[in-house]
Design a protein with these regions (language model features):
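Conserved CoA-thioester-binding segment of acyl-CoA-metabolizing enzymes
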Residues: 9-12, 16-111, 147
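Glycine- (often His-adjacent) and acidic-residue-rich active-site loop
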Residues: 67-79, 112-145, 164
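An acidic, glycine-rich surface segment that forms the CoA-thioester-binding/catalytic face
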Residues: 87-101, 124-161, 204
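CoA-thioester-processing core
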Residues: 145, 149, 159, 165-219, ...
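Well-ordered beta-strand positions
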Residues: 177, 217, 221-223, 229, ...
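C-terminal long alpha-helix characteristic of the crotonase
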Residues: 180-185, 236-289, 302, 318-322
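Short alpha-helical scaffolding segments that buttress acidic/His motifs in well-ordered protein cores
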Residues: 218-219, 272-276, 311
Length: 322
């Protein structure tokens, strides 16, 4: 009889915990003036079948990297390591442009396929076949694609579902916000162990994100570290204690929803991103001038009128992105 009670207790408490998390999620969304149960959409493969793409009902574009350790389309039971090749960069580029030109998209969400990896970076087997000149243009293409992502005036969130190393971290660093899944996963730029450097934006972005001294230590040692350490240095913004991959997807979608219409002023978010991205590279007085121009643009927008009027009337604004 006691054994039966233990079994019932073992099956009961996990359900209670899940219900409690759902209630807390609804409370969080209610505080934001929204209750949206948007779910993970059906994703469809891009041309080379190395990226899956889809858009949620509330305007979150999902770009999912999916390949094996050779950088080939995932077949059978091969582990999704999500390494990239030139063909994957073409798919990533096409997905970014699809999201950029879609007026219904407010947020771009990057993630990796499977339970283990966000991305392990470039396929070493693929790179080993290339000439030095080809590798140079390979890095240039990656630079251009990630710069396009950074210059898209929509918030970009990287959902780090697993190991994020090498070029995988370089992709993640081009996002505006990085959210990791709790687990025994590693982060790092170990390229020095191959006799090269992190050449698709690693040295440039890491030094800007964590500072020169910390970036140097990470890259010259090539060491890998945990998401917790990454969070301590502000390389990762948050770590979600999601029990399953599906729950992690839902948790990140719920967070992403706060940046979607009509709950967030998408035009203002885009201008904030433009000011931060472009302004850091110019003298302060020019940055202030850019800021004024972007603010002037917003003052003339319908969203600014909506937001200011709602504040005066003590109402919740509903933005249209105009």
């Amino acid at each position: 009889m006691e054994i039966g009670k233990e079994r019932r207790r073992d099956s009961f408490f996990p359900r209670v915990r899940e219900l409690a998390k759902l209630v807390l999620r609804l409370v969080d969304m209610a505080e934001l003036g929204r209750v949206s149960m948007t779910t993970w959409p059906e994703l469809k493969p891009m041309k080379n079948r190395l990226v899956n793409y889809g858009v949620t009902e509330n305007g979150v574009a999902i770009i999912e990297l999916v390949s094996d350790s050779d950088g080939e389309p995932l077949e059978g039971d091969r582990t999704a390591v999500n390494t990239y090749t030139r063909e994957m960069w073409h798919d990533i580029d096409d997905a970014i442009l699809s999201a950029r030109f879609d007026d219904d998209v407010s947020v771009i969400l990057l993630t990796g396929h499977g339970e283990k990896f966000f991305s392990a970076g470039a396929s070493i087997k693929y790179l080993n076949k290339l000439t030095p000149r080809y590798k140079y243009f390979f890095c240039l293409h990656a630079n251009e694609t990630l710069s396009r992502l950074e210059q898209t005036p929509k918030i970009v969130i990287a959902a780090l579902n697993g190991h994020t190393v090498g070029g995988g971290l370089e992709i993640a660093m081009a996002a505006d916000i990085r959210i990791a899944r709790k687990g025994n996963f590693q982060v790092g730029l170990p390229e020095v162990s191959l006799g090269v450097l992190a050449g698709t934006g690693g040295t440039a972005r890491l030094s800007r994100l964590v500072g020169k001294a910390k970036a140097m230590e990470i890259m010259v040692t090539g060491r890998k570290f945990s998401f917790e350490e990454a969070k301590d240095m502000d390389l990762v913004h948050d770590i979600y204690d999601s029990m399953t991959l599906e729950e992690f997807h839902q948790d990140v979608l719920d967070y992403s929803g706060r940046f979607t219409l009509p709950f967030a002023a998408a035009k203002a978010i885009g201008n904030i991103k433009r000011s931060v991205q472009s302004g850091l590279e110019i003298p302060l007085e020019y940055h202030l001038a850019l800021e004024r121009e972007l603010q002037s643009d917003l003052f003339q927008s319908d969203d600014a009128k909506t937001g200011i009027k709602a504040y005066v009337d003590k109402q919740t604004p509903r933005f249209e992105g105009k």
